Regions:
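Right-handed parallel beta-helix
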Residues: 69, 121-132, 161-177, 201-224, ...
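Soluble non-cytosolic domains of exported or imported proteins
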Residues: 24-27, 119, 162
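Right-handed parallel beta-helix/beta-solenoid
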Residues: 1-31, 48-50, 76, 80
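Right-handed parallel beta-helix/beta-spiral solenoid domain characteristic of secreted/periplasmic
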Residues: 63-146, 175-183
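Short, T/G/N/S-enriched strand-turn elements that build extracellular solenoid repeat scaffolds
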Residues: 31-37, 52-63, 83-85, 274, ...
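Extracellular beta-strand/beta-solenoid scaffold signature
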Residues: 56-60, 91-115, 139-159, 181-204, ...
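Extracellular beta-strand repeat scaffolds in secreted/surface proteins
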Residues: 42-46, 74
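Loop/turn elements at helix/coil->beta-strand transitions in domains of secreted/extracellular proteins
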Residues: 3-5, 39-43, 68
Length: 430
């Protein structure tokens, strides 16, 4: 069996003619790592203070849950985190292999990703700064409908069945100027997806079991902040009440998103998707949905989608969202802090929200069932504190709501059903 290796990369004093096997013989560019087929237990160390300009790190078909973890991290005692400035390089072609749950969503096209994990498992990436900027001349070019999608970190599951143990820790991802409109391309700060396999009968469904994203600072990204798990198998989750076995066969499991700070996301902040019992806790979403307005969201064509909330699950079963803090989400057709969206058994507890322009909480449409909102605190959320949007049921109990004069407790024209128990609604005095 081949022995694992530690590779060193330094933009400051490396040389691509070196062997990369020691600090004194470090590689200079990330391209040298892209050329290597990493094996279980390999480590890639990037020197603090290094800046990898117009570079990217793309790993494919590596890692094994039955072997040691691959790790990519910083080394050195002093200096800033190693920084990858991709600037629209690292282009790959994304294709779900099918249309998505709404026919207007774009499902294929070019994407620029600073870090791409394509059919990679059992990997830890930490202690890196990432940007993927576009130097646009004016708002018309920024808002262009065909602008290329960009990602800080993208992950794809396709031809290896279930991918296990992908961990992202202490990443500073900012200034990722992706497409304003594309919701389900790998487009934003961190975005993970599953594509149609070449031979699903042989490999099994493409899915994730074991994703942990923690301690990351995601700032000024478009469109999504952190999204885990949009899937080509979306049709298997069309029912109102969702069966656990469907998730174990086609969906995602053991998804943990915690201790992250998302600021100025163009659209939504944090969303697990098609996941069984995902845990989303101790996150902060600050001033998100900044591009969901007529000034920027100008040319959606058939994509529609000028909607975003902050922290919410999509088509999940028994999602738990707790100890999160959301403020200043910008007004759009949604614009609230939290949203139980077309899922079964979503639970929000011990969360805080304040000054969100679309309100505190939404129960979204007829497929949002068996959801609860308990022991949360809302302070001066606007437009309407609660948004029951045609949902058949919701249990809202033991919450405290501080409501500004003139702001309705239930958003206007909302007629979903809620059971209210032991809540405190306190008027904010002028």
């Amino acid at each position: 069996m081949k022995k694992s290796t530690i590779y060193f990369v330094s933009s400051l004093n490396g040389n691509d003619e070196n062997d990369g096997l020691s600090e004194s013989t470090a590689f200079k560019s990330l391209n040298k790592i892209n050329e290597i087929e990493l094996i279980p237990g390999d480590k890639v160390f990037l020197l603090r203070g290094s800046v990898f300009e117009n570079e990217f790190l793309h790993l494919k078909n590596c890692g094994d849950i039955n072997g040691d973890m691959i790790e990519i991290t910083a080394y050195g005692q002093d200096g800033d985190l190693p920084k990858i400035n991709t600037n629209g390089q690292g282009v790959w072609y994304q294709d779900y292999g099918c249309e998505l749950d709404y026919s207007g969503h774009i499902y294929k096209g070019n994407v620029s990703s600073s870090i791409l994990l394509y059919d990679v498992e059992n990997i830890l990436i930490r202690n890196i700064e990432i940007t993927n900027k576009e130097e646009f001349k004016d708002m018309e070019s920024y808002c262009a409908p065909d602008k290329m999608d960009r990602t800080g970190v993208a992950a794809v599951a396709k031809n290896r069945g279930t991918l296990h143990s992908i961990k992202l820790d202490n990443l500073f991802i900012h200034d990722v100027n992706g497409n304003v409109y594309n919701k389900h391309m790998n487009n934003g700060g961190i975005y993970m997806t599953s594509f149609t396999p070449d031979n699903e009968k042989e490999t099994g469904a493409a899915r994730y079991d074991g994703v942990e994203i923690k301690n990351c600072y995601v700032k000024n990204v478009s469109r999504w902040g952190i999204a885990v798990g949009y899937s080509y198998r979306h049709k298997d989750f069309a029912a109102k009440e969702l069966d656990e076995e469907t998730f174990k066969k086609y969906g995602n499991e053991n998804i943990i998103i915690k201790n992250n700070y998302v600021k100025y996301a163009g659209g939504d902040a944090i969303t697990p998707m098609y996941a069984l019992t995902p845990l989303v806790e101790h996150n902060i979403a600050d001033s998100c949905a900044t591009e969901m307005n007529d000034r920027i969201y100008k040319y959606p064509q058939k994509r529609a989608g000028k909607v975003a909330a902050a922290i919410w699950p999509w088509k999940c079963k028994n999602a738990l969202l707790r100890y999160n803090d959301v403020c200043d989400t910008k007004l759009n057709q949604d614009g609230m802090a939290y949203d139980a969206d077309s899922g079964d058994g979503t639970k929000y507890e011990y969360n805080y929200s304040r000054l969100n322009e679309g309100g505190c909480m939404m129960f979204c449409l007829q497929q949002a069932v068996h959801n609860t909102f308990e022991n949360n605190l809302s302070v001066d959320d606007l437009s309407g504190t609660m948004t029951p949007a045609s949902n058949p049921d919701a249990y809202v109990a033991n919450n405290t709501f501080y409501v500004r004069a003139g702001v309705p407790f239930v958003r206007k024209r909302m007629h979903g059903k809620m059971t209210l128990k032991n809540n405190k609604v306190i008027k904010i005095e002028k």
